[in-house]
Amino acid sequence: MKALYFDCFSGISGDMILGALIDLGIDVEKWKTELNKIPVKGYKIEISKKQKNSIWGTDVNIIIDDHHSHRHLEDLLKIVDESGLSENIKTKAKNIFYKIAEAEAKIHNQPIDEVHFHEIGALDTIIDVLGSLILLEMLEVEEIYSSPLPLGSGFVNTAHGTIPVPAPATLEILRGIPVYKDGREGELVTPTGAAIISTVANFVQELPPIRVDKIGYGCGKKDFSFPNLLRVYVGELVESTVKERNIVLETNIDDMNPQIFGYLVEKLFKEGALDVFLTPVYMKKGRPGILLSVIAPLVMEERLSEVIFRETTTLGIRKIYVDKKIMPREIKEIETKWGKVRIKVANINGIRKAYPEYEDCKSIAERENIPLKDVILEIEKLMERE
């Protein structure tokens, strides 16, 4: 199974993510072609090699023509919806922008629709977020991991004045994420970097065994006594089956308006749940109820528990630690009459399974105005001939 690991020894920011992923050897022209599917103008991208403490990495500089442009969250979501990017990228991008906007709204005591500021409105942030997601999709990795994040210390000047490091919005975004301080001064994690990494990666204390194939370094803009670089590794996970430790949060609910469950499930996924499901149950005194089950990475326990307590009527949550085995998987492409479609293929000990990617099938069904089941059936027939 192909995996990617973010080694955040100097923190993380949007431009560092872009630089590190491009440094892996991505086809930059193909990436820029994908960027052109975003309905925004007024920027150009400069990519160069730079040295940080004798280590060379890729520096990505996004030059904005108009520095006076401001946008609200609604504007950003419209840009995402109107882009020609994949549904997978659109969903993750919306989650990232929501995280930044929610954090700023809470810190500045504003309704989320009134948040009007540089951080989510700036063009470079739009390119950081969507550009990073495009690069990750181009790499076709199945698993993404990250080290804990160093927060830095001191103070930083912003459009809102001088604020402490980590910036309050950054810390808000990182609730439930493993972080640490080691005495280094300076802002090491930006709100954009925090929002991207907390959306795409599973945080681990130790990197699972991986056969490293490529290594990339992305340059930060500031110079410190240590190399201001983000390092990424890409390679194959070594174990025949990937083992993953998760937590299951459960609670029985019998006194809540059922309309709330749909919103709750969406909220839990947005906050980092791996899976959420509802099971009808009979509880004490013969009362019908719903068993809410949430599967999540260990580091998301506190964050998701808070969502459950805040959004439901429950007074308690059970937690169960579980080990999960995953068949090694890879993504392949198959040529169809509608264009290329991604296929997820899993193999272990002679057992083979293959499935067309749902988002690709959904896009075809919507574009061609044909039933989704017909699209899936046609692609499955093509897969049998391969």
Swiss-Prot record:
Q: Which Gene3D superfamilies match?
A: mk0293 like domain, Transcriptional regulatory protein pf0864 domain like
Gene Ontology MF annotations: lyase activity; nickel cation binding
Name this protein carries in UniProt? Putative nickel insertion protein
For whether the record's keyword set contains Ribosomal protein, the answer is: no
Similarity comment: family membership: Belongs to the LarC family.
Where does the signal sequence lie?
none
Question: What keywords are annotated for this sequence in UniProt?
Answer: Nickel
Q: Which InterPro entries match?
A: Ni_insertion (IPR002822)
